[in-house]
Design a protein with these regions (language model features):
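Active-site microenvironment for binding and transforming phosphate-containing groups
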Residues: 1-245
Length: 245
């Protein structure tokens, strides 16, 4: 992965998490997974973290336990959303765990909680504020719906943001309805037929007043160590996780 000089890898037994050392110093843990180091069989090989894509549930649960162990959070207090490509927010409170409802933005001020989103081309966005952290699932529909701006509003003053691995314009040709929707929101379009969710998320963050933004250079379709729905169709999901420390 290529993020910034402060990003580093942790993990063992083939599992690798990318984290940010500066974030840890500021009291937030953030972790990005790829597809390596799990127990799922093809086409979900191997660190699939999604239970609703056709994989065996016990394997998904083991994969989540492995990630939690490597990252140092309690999987019993992991909160996820049923992602619907919109902009609905759910605040995760002490004691919330599992699938907490339909949303594409999760925010928490609870130090016992870990929040997570799952992706396979959409851009995962981490937002950090004073005593609060949020995650945004930013696919093209969510970007057009204003999910990033909604996440910023839910966080309050955003001190820093991270945009994780997503599909890039090189691999993401879309139809005219997507191009029209992006242009209507002043989101970037490449060559009149391609979009980049990560770059669009960064533009939306800047428009919402966020100044400190780290953006991954990884294209999930180009890099086969990541799950990509556009490239593979039926496949698994990598995860992005955040917790207050």
């Amino acid at each position: 992965m290529s993020f910034s000089p402060s990003m580093s890898e942790v993990g063992a037994d083939g599992l690798r998490l990318v984290t940010d050392e500066r974030a840890a110093e500021r009291g937030i843990g953030i972790f990005f997974t790829d597809r390596r180091g799990g127990v799922s069989a093809a086409p979900f090989d191997s660190l699939n973290l999604a239970a609703r894509v056709g994989d065996e549930v016990d394997r998904v649960e083991e994969n989540r336990r492995r990630v939690a162990g490597a990252a140092g959070f309690d999987v019993a207090y992991l909160a996820l959303a049923r992602q619907v490509h919109g902009a609905r927010v759910i605040e995760v409170r002490d004691g919330d765990a599992g699938v907490v409802g339909e949303a594409d933005v999760l925010v928490t001020r609870a130090r016992a909680a870990t929040i997570g989103i799952l992706t396979a081309d959409c851009a995962p966005v981490v937002l950090w504020g004073d005593g609060v952290v949020a995650l945004v699932h930013a696919g093209w529909r969510g970007l057009v719906a204003g999910a990033v701006e909604t996440g910023v509003a839910a966080t309050g003053k955003v001190n820093a943001a991270w945009v994780g691995p997503s599909i890039h314009a090189c691999c993401y040709e879309v139809g005219p309805e997507v191009i029209d929707a992006f242009e209507g929101r002043n989101l970037p379009v490449a060559d009149g037929a391609h979009v980049d969710p990560g770059r669009a998320a960064a533009v939306a963050l800047q428009g919402a007043g966020v100044e400190a933004i780290v953006v991954s250079e990884v294209c999930t379709s180009c890099d086969r160590s990541y799950f990509s729905h556009r490239r593979d169709g039926v496949t698994g999901r990598q995860g992005t996780f955040a917790t207050l420390t």
